[in-house]
Amino acid sequence: HIDAPIHFVENKRYLEDIDLKELVLPLIVLDFSTEVANNNDFIVTRAHIEAWEKEHGTIEPGTFVALRTDWSKRWPNIEKFENKDANGQQHAPGWGLDALKYLI
């Protein structure tokens, strides 16, 4: 799905204000499903992205970078999807802040 910028930042655009051509971008999928299978708390770091670029080439500005973790395969089992420990803390993969800053 897609969220409008206004959903996250005050005074930003609504979906109807975004031109369709802004939503059609080159795509790269970083597949870390194997790493996630071995580590539920796997976090993509800048080093992971730099290693990917070393093998595949530089990620060009304006490219949409998606993350494949296969976490969605846990659905519809809520317990597996939420993956809570004994203290109720969820454990799931995601992006590290350094990776996001690098991509922006």
Where are these regions (language model features)?
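Active-/binding-site microenvironments in catalytic and ligand-binding cores
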Residues: I2-I104
